[in-house]
From Swiss-Prot:
Phylogenetic classification of the source organism: Bacteria, Pseudomonadati, Pseudomonadota, Gammaproteobacteria, Pseudomonadales
Keyword rRNA-binding annotated: no
Species whose genome carries this gene: Pseudomonas savastanoi pv. phaseolicola (strain 1448A / Race 6) (Pseudomonas syringae pv. phaseolicola (strain 1448A / Race 6))
Stated name of the protein: Transcriptional repressor NrdR
UniProt keywords, alphabetically: ATP-binding, DNA-binding, Metal-binding, Nucleotide-binding, Repressor, Transcription, Transcription regulation, Zinc, Zinc-finger
ZnF start-end (unnamed): 3-34
Designated gene of the protein: nrdR
Coiled coil ranges: none
Cofactor(s) listed in the protein's UniProt record: Zn(2+)
All residue ranges annotated as the ATP-cone domain in the record: 49-139
NCBIfam families on file: transcriptional regulator NrdR (TIGR00244)
Amino acid sequence: MHCPFCGANDTKVIDSRLVAEGEQVRRRRECLACGERFTTFETAELVLPRLIKQDGSRQPFDEEKLRAGMQRALEKRPVSVERLEAALVHIKHKLRATGEREVKSLVVGELVMAELQKLDEVAYIRFASVYRRFQDLNEFREEIDRLAREPGKE
């Protein structure tokens, strides 16, 4: 770590502690050249993979776009913001867990549908109808019938 006062490379850590609910490490440092002390904060940089669109183009992951799409599906449904945010965290965690630098947008779409299905089946159908481009009522019926046949449904 470079000393911000003299620019020397030799510094030592005097004290380290977790802050921000364990999300950051605060380090008190001392420069071995000039003796000045300073504080640094370290956070993990968690990068989400880039998305490979169906047309082959690539774009950075956009959390706001993901949130907006899920909010649109959940509009006027009895699902709290907290549950939506938890679903977003779960999706991002699964994307990071792939360890890949790029993932197909289809993977994100499937993760969203899985989370929406857990949150609210009406929202799931809304999202699926756009995502899978349902063309007629028959496709809606087939998806609803598939949902009804799943284990654990009355």
